[in-house]
Amino acid sequence: MQPLGEGDFTHLIPRLEADARAAGQPLRISGLTPEGAAAVRRAHPEFGIWRNRDYEDYVYRADDLRNLTGRRYQPKRNHINRFEAAYDYRYEELTPALAPECMRLEREWRAGHDSHAAELTAEQRAMQRAFDHFGELELRGGALFVGEKLVAFTIGSAINDEAFCIHVEKADTRYDGAFTIINK
């Protein structure tokens, strides 16, 4: 993540590289603003910088996700309708007590996705840390069950009174609409 605040942060990159090397990892910086990417490019032209759409943010109005009104959200409504017709489900508030089930679902999800193993392992570690410090980090989330099986969960936190950030969202895609329902 790009450091926050004013001023030039590029002088910190050698320290970040040393820290990554000590952890046996290559240095990866994500979440750069266009200005931050330009600063890194100027200070370290040897670095490769590219866009990864898999890590881009999606911004929705909370009311839009709650109500799903309009033509734009028709596909989401269709997913929800199919899910509700097909499954007897329940939604629960996410608590750290559900961590083992969430980690199991994450492992199942990861097994079905072709991606960079190091990135996925880092995500798994981050998820475990999030559960370990759930209260301290003021995290909130939801869990979706079909019968007794956890089929989706989400973890996030309030950015301010008007914005909420989803940090992790996983669903068993064999349950059509699970991602959409956990979002609602």
Where is each model-derived feature located?
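Conserved acetyl-CoA binding element of GNAT-fold acetyltransferases
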Residues: 1-7, 13-14, 162-172
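Short, polar loop motifs at secondary-structure junctions
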Residues: 32-37, 76-78
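Short, aromatic/basic amphipathic alpha-helical patches
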Residues: 36-47
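Short, conserved active-site entrance elements at the starts or edges of catalytic domains
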Residues: 101-149
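Aromatic (often tryptophan-rich) hydrophobic motifs at membrane interfaces
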Residues: 139-184
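Conserved GNAT acetyl-CoA-binding A-motif
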Residues: 22-34
